[in-house]
A protein has these predicted regions:
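Conserved N-terminal subdomain of the carbohydrate kinase-like
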Residues: 39-44, 49, 64-147, 309-323
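Glycine-rich phosphate/adenosyl-contacting loop at the front of the ribokinase-like
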Residues: 1-72, 82-83, 170, 253-254, ...
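Conserved phosphate-binding/catalytic region of the ribokinase-like
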Residues: 1-20, 43, 214-325
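Hydrophobic beta-strand scaffold residues
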Residues: 69, 95, 172-173, 224
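Short, conserved phosphate/pyrophosphate- and ester-handling motifs at nucleotide-, phospho-/glycolipid
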Residues: 62, 205, 261
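Phosphate- and divalent-cation-binding pockets in alpha/beta enzyme and binding domains
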Residues: 80-83, 106, 211-212, 232-234, ...
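Conserved beta-alpha-beta core of the PfkB/ribokinase-like small-molecule kinase fold
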Residues: 142-219, 223, 230-233
């Protein structure tokens, strides 16, 4: 079975590798219309608030799966932002955030078949290089990033985090994020950025993979995990060789697909940190994603317990806070 890059010799009962995940605390506003929307009219709907955000979602799932997780990023300098950041500690996540601006809100419109359409405001990830510190990333074994963090506004902070973790001997995983980014940046420039980041593992969905590699020949610095929704997930080697294809277990009902990709990444990363092989890591991601799509909201209940066996984290420490600006 194909192996994932190793964090070091596993020690029974020893400290766990530390996974740092960058992102922005987000308040999701989930809307499930109870009848078809009518232009210019009003529609009775189920509406509720839920924590969200790519990075927090991945961090939450990985922690529930037994990983030692640190969230490094941004929260609004308001009551909601502080509460969202504090909520991550409920599942044992170390929090190292800069609080500034207002909390980012995302409107999530859920259709009858569970598919979601999102609209987000402009209060998203915008960390400068001086807001990302070496202390926040000390002892990190794996850094998980999203491609849009390398946008002009946030590029300096993301590159600094990458350099700090690489200098400490850590590895990197990268999520393509969404098809709109490829269309905005351009295919060749997007591929160049992937090469520059050089992630050990790259996550993409089917649409993103087709946009990046239209000939079907996958090329990347490391492993590439391509998700196909309810269809099997395929993992490719850097030279395009197909390593494994893993079936996605059926769920009783798809309620809301919000956060499915984040949950898959979180489960995968936690399994990787446990020393699992590629097949086992994908299976772990499928399990967590399946649980998320069976409910409303992008984060599982804090009582969820996955396959991980939480032991002492490799690097102990209190929750960090970079201060506000």
């Amino acid at each position: 079975m194909a192996a994932l890059p190793r964090f070091g010799p596993p020690v029974a009962g020893g400290p766990r590798p530390v996974i740092a995940i960058m992102g922005c605390m987000v308040q999701d506003i989930v809307v499930k219309p109870l009848s078809p929307l009518v232009a210019g009219g009003s529609t009775m709907s189920q509406i509720f608030f839920a924590p969200g955000g790519f990075g927090p979602n991945v961090a939450w799932t990985a922690a529930l799966e037994g990983a030692a997780v640190r969230f490094v990023g941004q929260a609004g300098a308001d009551t909601v932002g502080g509460a969202l950041a504090e909520s991550l500690t409920e599942v044992g996540i170390e929090v190292a955030v800069t609080q500034k601006g207002t909390t980012c809100c995302v409107l999530v419109l859920v259709s009858d078949d569970g598919q979601r359409t999102m609209a987000y405001d402009t209060s998203s990830f915008s960390l400068r290089a001086d807001e990302v510190t070496a202390d926040q990333l000390a002892g990190v074994d794996l850094l998980h990033l999203y491609e849009n963090m390398f946008d002009d506004i946030t590029a300096a902070g993301a590159w600094k985090a990458l350099r700090v973790v690489r200098a400490g001997g850590g590895m990197v995983s990268l999520d393509v994020g969404n098809i709109a980014r490829i269309q905005l940046v351009g295919r060749e420039q997007f591929l160049d950025r992937i090469d520059q980041v050089a992630p050990e593992v790259l996550f993409a969905n089917e649409e993103e993979a087709e946009a990046l590699w239209p000939t079907g020949r996958v090329r990347a610095p490391g492993l590439v995990v391509v998700k196909h929704g309810a269809w099997p997930t395929t993992v490719y080697a850097s030279d395009g060789e197909e390593l494994v294809t893993v079936r996605v277990p059926a769920v009783d009902a798809v309620v809301d697909t919000t956060g499915a990709g984040d949950a898959m990444a979180g489960g995968f990363l936690a399994a990787w940190a446990r020393g699992c092989d590629v097949n086992e890591a994908v299976e772990a991601g499928h399990r967590t994603a399946g649980a998320v799509v069976s409910q409303y909201g992008a984060q599982l209940p804090p009582t969820w317990r996955g396959a991980g066996d939480p032991g002492p984290p490799r690097h102990q420490g209190d929750a960090l806070n970079a201060g506000s600006s």
